[in-house]
């Protein structure tokens, strides 16, 4: 999770986020080298009187500055396309969860379980327990099993929202009348925080997402408990 005065990304929790961090470092290195070269040329031009004002043709130079940017773009595009393919690939998910955005809360439905659906509201600041995080805690966390592929279906009941979980490298738009599909896999247990990342009205900043990744045994116990509680609640 993020912490005050943090530099860089949150700790990666999924293989996708690890790939995104490597790609970020790879691209940043290329940008740094290009910027250094441009800065060096500018300084050289400002500090020397030897300029080629009479040069009319330089095919070798033109060939180099045409081919070199093309090679650099390929070096950026290939890993980017690979990660895009990995993010869209969904193979035999263990379960499917539908997340619906509302003004201003989230609702979740486990489509593989009967009557397992609930709303998730932010806990007001005055109701927080010691140690809980302001504007990030919810009354009902979404619990999922770790180390298993999970398919998320994202949509909205009213306006545009965005379901975002930085530690997992996920961000999907919630659009009314349309289902967006993403996959997530957590490599470790823990509680992870996200928020709506699309301005959706006056309480946009009060739509946190809390995802608890746990063992499969704990998840099955939690799902059974939630089903029993919801069945009793709606009798």
Swiss-Prot record:
Listed SUPFAM superfamilies: Cupredoxins, Cytochrome c oxidase subunit II-like, transmembrane region
Keyword Transcription on entry: no
Compartments, record wording: Mitochondrion inner membrane
Primary site of residence: mitochondrion
Signal peptide stretch: none
CDD domains: CcO_II_C
Positions of post-translational Phosphotyrosine modification: 218
Complex and partners: Component of the cytochrome c oxidase (complex IV, CIV), a multisubunit enzyme composed of 14 subunits. The complex is composed of a catalytic core of 3 subunits MT-CO1, MT-CO2 and MT-CO3, encoded in the mitochondrial DNA, and 11 supernumerary subunits COX4I, COX5A, COX5B, COX6A, COX6B, COX6C, COX7A, COX7B, COX7C, COX8 and NDUFA4, which are encoded in the nuclear genome.
Cofactor note as given: Binds a dinuclear copper A center per subunit.
EC number: 7.1.1.9
Stretches of the chain found on the membrane's Mitochondrial intermembrane side: 1-14, 88-235
Lineage: superkingdom: Eukaryota
Protein's recorded name: Cytochrome c oxidase subunit 2
Catalytic activity annotation: 4 Fe(II)-[cytochrome c] + O2 + 8 H(+)(in) = 4 Fe(III)-[cytochrome c] + 2 H2O + 4 H(+)(out)
Uppermost EC category: translocase
PROSITE patterns from the UniProt entry: COX2 (PS00078), COX2_CUA (PS50857), COX2_TM (PS50999)
Species: Didelphis virginiana (North American opossum)
């Amino acid at each position: 999770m993020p912490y005050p005065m943090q530099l860089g990304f949150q700790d990666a929790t999924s293989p996708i986020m690890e790939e995104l961090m490597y790609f970020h470092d790879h691209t940043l290195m290329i940008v740094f080298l290009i910027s250094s070269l441009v800065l060096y040329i500018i300084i050289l031009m400002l500090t020397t009187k030897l300029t080629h004002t009479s040069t009319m043709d330089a095919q070798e130079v033109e060939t180099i500055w045409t081919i070199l940017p093309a090679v650099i773009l390929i070096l950026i595009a290939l890993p980017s396309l690979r990660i895009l393919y990995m993010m869209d690939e969904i193979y035999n998910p263990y379960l499917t969860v539908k997340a619906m955005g509302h003004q201003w809360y989230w609702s979740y439905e486990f489509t593989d379980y009967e009557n397992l659906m609930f709303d998730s509201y932010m806990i007001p600041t005055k109701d927080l327990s010691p140690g809980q995080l302001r504007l990030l805690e919810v009354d009902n966390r979404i619990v999922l099993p770790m180390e298993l592929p999970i398919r998320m279906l994202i949509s909205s009941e009213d306006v545009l929202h965005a379901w975002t979980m930085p530690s997992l490298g996920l961000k999907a738009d919630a659009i009314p009348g349309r289902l967006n599909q993403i996959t997530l896999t957590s490599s470790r247990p823990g509680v992870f925080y996200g928020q709506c990342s699309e301005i959706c009205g006056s309480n946009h900043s009060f739509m946190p997402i809390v995802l608890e990744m746990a063992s499969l045994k704990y998840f099955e116990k939690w799902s059974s408990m939630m089903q029993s509680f919801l069945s009793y609640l709606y009798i």
